[in-house]
A protein has these predicted regions:
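Conserved core of the sugar-phosphate nucleotidyltransferase
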Residues: 114-194
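Short beta-strand-to-loop acidic/aromatic patch adjacent to the donor-nucleotide binding site
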Residues: 103-114
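Short acidic/His/Gly/Ser-rich catalytic and metal-binding motifs that mark active-site loops
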Residues: 9-15, 181-184
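Conserved alpha/beta core of the MobA/IspD/sugar-nucleotide pyrophosphorylase nucleotidyltransferase superfamily
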Residues: 2, 167-247
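Short beta-strand/turn micro-motifs composed of small residues
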Residues: 6-7, 53, 110, 133-134
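Short alpha-helical oligomerization interface
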Residues: 18-23
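A short acidic, often aromatic-flanked loop/helix-cap motif at beta-alpha or helix-coil junctions
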Residues: 82-87, 139, 225-228
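Conserved N-terminal catalytic core of the sugar/cofactor nucleotidyltransferase
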Residues: 1-4, 12-14, 26, 30-104
Length: 247
């Protein structure tokens, strides 16, 4: 199952004068939503898609209309009545409402990232989970620290703390939904400490719980030129101004 959390408040976009939710904004003749979802075009017929959105903003009708236009075979929309404490809690509530079996694999992806031609990496097939990364500058990312330079095994993840040059793209895989759920529930049990450390309930730091339990977590590095971000008004504006097709 591919899970798309999209229940954020889009405050930066609202403050910049945008009236509609970020995912509805136009980009290259489509919505940003459609551009992001086309990342998984090869899976439109084979995978279920779960969208977790805010109630009361017309999200369900918009998502289902776009999914029908794109040809996504099995879309499901869960709407939330109240804000969450972060992306991880949004995903957790969506999985619960959708009745996702704990044995199912889940792939979580941001609705403001475009990953043209995505294909599941074969080397991650025998892992308990994986994070996609690019090499980039700055402190505003989620980060992965490899166990060594000779392996793709992950020793640690962090949020807004640069522990390596490997920056998460917002694509997170868990071989079992139950592992994600357990890690998220552990974080919620100590939400005060977790929020003090990370600011909100992000997905990437949850992998530390799984790593501590002996799970085999790996990373896959994508070329930076193959990942396009629209998480801020500046990033979105740059994509609009580029007037180029996304490879």
């Amino acid at each position: 199952m591919i899970v798309i959390p999209m229940a954020g408040q889009s405050r930066r976009f609202r403050d910049a004068g945008y009236a509609r939710p970020k995912y509805e904004l136009p980009l290259h003749g489509e919505s940003l939503f459609a551009c992001c979802l086309r990342s998984f075009e090869r899976y439109f017929d084979s995978e279920r898609f779960l969208f977790v959105a805010r109630a009361g903003c017309g999200a369900e009708a918009f998502v289902l209309e776009e999914c029908a236009r794109l040809g996504i075979a099995e879309p499901r929309v869960v709407t939330l009545d109240a804000p969450t404490r972060g992306q991880a809690e949004t995903v957790l509530l969506g999985l619960r409402e959708a009745g996702c079996p704990g044995s199912d694999a889940i792939l979580v992806f941001n609705i403001d990232t475009i990953r043209p031609g995505y294909s599941f990496p074969p080397e991650a097939a025998h892992s308990d989970g994986y994070l996609e990364v690019v090499r980039a500058a700055g402190e505003h990312w989620s980060f992965v620290r490899p166990a060594s330079s000779l392996t793709r095994r992950v020793a640690e993840t962090s949020e807004k703390r640069r522990i390596s040059a490997l920056c998460c793209t917002g694509l997170y895989y868990f071989a079992r939904a139950a592992d994600f759920t357990a890690a998220c529930e552990t974080a919620l049990q100590t939400a005060g400490d977790y929020l003090e450390c990370w600011g909100e309930l992000y997905v990437a730091p949850l992998y530390n719980t799984l790593i501590g339990a002996g799970k085999h977590i790996v990373y896959d590095e994508a070329p930076a030129s193959r990942v396009h971000f629209a998480g801020t008004p500046a990033e979105y504006g740059a994509l609009v101004a580029s007037h180029r097709s996304l490879p």
